[in-house]
From Swiss-Prot:
Modified sites of kind N-acetylalanine: A2
Start and end residues of each stretch annotated as Disordered: 38-59
Pfam families referenced in this protein's UniProt entry, alphabetically: CRIM, SIN1, SIN1_PH
Location in the cell: Cell membrane; Endoplasmic reticulum membrane; Early endosome membrane; Late endosome membrane
Keywords: Acetylation, Cell membrane, Cytoplasm, Endoplasmic reticulum, Endosome, Golgi apparatus, Lysosome, Membrane, Mitochondrion, Mitochondrion outer membrane, Nucleus, Phosphoprotein, Stress response
Residues in coiled coil: none
Region (Interaction with MAP3K2): 2-184
Principal location class: membrane
Organism the protein comes from: Rattus norvegicus
Protein function: Component of the mechanistic target of rapamycin complex 2 (mTORC2), which transduces signals from growth factors to pathways involved in proliferation, cytoskeletal organization, lipogenesis and anabolic output. In response to growth factors, mTORC2 phosphorylates and activates AGC protein kinase family members, including AKT (AKT1, AKT2 and AKT3), PKC (PRKCA, PRKCB and PRKCE) and SGK1. In contrast to mTORC1, mTORC2 is nutrient-insensitive.
Protein name: Target of rapamycin complex 2 subunit MAPKAP1
Length: 522
């Protein structure tokens, strides 16, 4: 037993003992900061002291220098000790035993007996491979199907079949489109071809899918193998191609467009459709006339009648009274609807209700068509803008941009930077559909530099009037252009407006007649 009174030596001895015996490390954690306290209690010696003092304290500080154990670190992980070499060796032996279990040792033994060359040859005997004669048995169902569908193998548009969405309805976004084919004959072009495409397909992919389905169904005539030779145009419900708008961009996705009816047109014939604009048939009716565009003279009179009725009734279903076509020069003689336009030798017809007749002089005042007038009528549907002044009742006139086309009339205010709108009401833009237009009349013409015209339209079951002023030439052109548009469209609002106007006129005439009658009796 040893008696020690030096705390530094005692602390070093305790730490060395716990390094080999304490697995928890708690004693090291408790005694780790004790050296700091000892350093405070034993300050370093001041230079200049005697050598005896240094030698006297060297024995005491020797234990203090080695008091800190090499296995104890003053850090956040002081409670975690490294594994001993024995534990690491035992772990390595355990893993080696597990690996030995997975391995299988096979002892190699050489044979003393030698095999002959004949025995070795019999082990790998060469077999004779004879070609089997072709069996003349029954054909498989796959072979029969391939022979029955030769067009499927020779379809040059097979790469676009992956965009067919008929098998993906309900699981993937698809789009159903009715496609008219103007290159068909007159009978087949009336019925569209329904195509179901993937919503992620582009317009170019849709064109290829249409060509693939067209070829797979064995339709005639055959298409060009190059998909780039075709384009998609907007089409009406009856298959008429709307050439006022350009074709769809082939690089755009098809879901970007909301049209459910399209037409497949050849690119070289798409701009050439203007050559067909000279073929127009005039259909006279009770409240005006309509110009029906036809592709050629082989069209039947039944198709012309259907187009005239649709132009007259708009988007409504063709129902109600039945109509027939008569030549303008031959009243009360119906035209055979199965005959072609070429066999009629006429370009002007009259639309008459069944079980009715027309007088010989009906529509004769408009029977003679001037070529210049027809050209003005056709160009009246093209968009053109005019700068005019809009007249208000309780405030000054405002400058507006009046845009007129065959579909609508747009009134956009012209912003003037110099004019202050702080104390005046700002003019709002107005858009009027041509089906709601009723009349356009010249109100007054004071001088060649000043004229006023009135525009009447239907708004929420009420007729509203707008007044504009400009020079006489501009006003005359606007009135003529709008009236050409109104005459070429069978508008219900326009017919009701004139009927109401006629009733008011009859009521005034009847009232004035009764007033004159009473004054005569007195």
């Amino acid at each position: 037993m040893a008696f020690l009174d030096n705390p530094t030596i005692i602390l070093a001895h305790i730490r060395q003992s716990h390094v080999t015996s304490d697995d928890t490390g708690m004693c090291e954690m408790v005694l780790i900061d004790h050296d700091v306290d000892l350093e405070k209690t034993h300050p370093p010696s001041v230079p200049g002291d005697s050598g005896s003092e240094v030698q006297g304290s060297s024995g005491e500080t020797q234990g203090y220098i080695y008091a800190q154990s090499v296995d104890i670190t003053s850090s956040w992980d002081f409670g975690i000790r490294r594994r001993s070499n024995t534990a690491q060796r035992l772990e390595r032996l355990r893993k080696e035993r597990q690996n030995q279990i997975k391995c299988k040792n096979i002892q190699w033994k050489e044979r003393n007996s030698k095999q002959s060359a004949q025995e070795l040859k019999s082990l790998f005997e060469k077999k004779s491979l004879k070609e089997k004669p072709p069996s003349s048995g029954k054909q498989s169902i796959l072979s029969v199907r391939l022979e029955q569908c030769p067009l499927q193998l020779n379809n040059p548009f097979n790469e676009y079949s992956k965009f067919d969405g008929k098998g993906h309805v309900g699981t993937t976004a698809t789009k159903k489109i009715d496609v008219y084919l103007p290159l068909h004959s007159s009978q087949d072009r009336l019925l569209p071809m329904t195509v179901v495409t993937m919503a992620s397909a582009r317009v170019q992919d849709l064109i290829g899918l249409i060509c693939w389905q067209y070829t797979s169904e064995g339709r005639e005539p055959k298409l060009n193998d190059n998909v780039s030779a075709y384009c998609l145009h907007i089409a009406e419900d009856d298959g008429e191609v709307d050439t006022d708008f350009p074709p769809l961009d082939s690089n755009e996705p098809i879901h970007k467009f909301g049209f459910s009816t399209l037409a497949l047109v050849e690119k070289y014939s798409s701009p050439g459709l203007t050559s067909k604009e000279s073929l127009f048939v005039r259909i006279n009716a009770a409240h005006g006339f309509s110009l029906i565009q036809v592709d050629n003279t082989k069209v039947t009179m039944k198709e012309i009648l259907l187009k005239a009725l649709k132009r007259r009734k708009g988007s409504q279903k063709i129902s109600g009274p039945q109509y027939r076509l008569e030549k303008q020069s031959e009243p009360n003689i119906g035209v055979d609807l199965e005959s072609t336009l070429e066999s009629q030798n006429a370009w002007e017809f009259c639309l008459v209700r069944e079980n009715s007749s027309r007088a010989d002089g009906v529509f004769e005042e408009d029977s003679q068509i001037d070529i210049a007038t027809v050209q003005d009528m056709l160009s009246s549907h093209h968009y053109k803008s005019f700068k005019v002044s809009m007249i208000h009742r309780l405030r000054f006139t405002t400058d507006v941009q009046l845009g007129i086309s065959g579909d609508k009339v747009e009134i956009d205010p012209v912003t003037n930077q110099k004019a202050s709108t702080k104390f005046w009401i700002k003019q709002k833009p107005i858009s009027i559909d041509c089906d709601l237009l009723c009349a356009c009349d010249l109100a007054e013409e004071k001088s060649p530099s000043h004229a006023v015209f009135k525009l009447t339209y239907l708004s929420s079951h009420d007729y509203k009037h707008l007044y504009f002023e400009s020079d006489a030439a501009t006003v005359s052109e606007i009135v003529l252009k709008v009236n050409y548009i109104l005459e070429s469209r069978a508008s219900t609002a326009r017919a009701d407006y004139f009927a109401q106007k006629q009733r008011k006129l009859n009521r005034r005439t009847s009232f004035s007649f009764q007033k004159e009658k009473k004054s005569g009796q007195q």
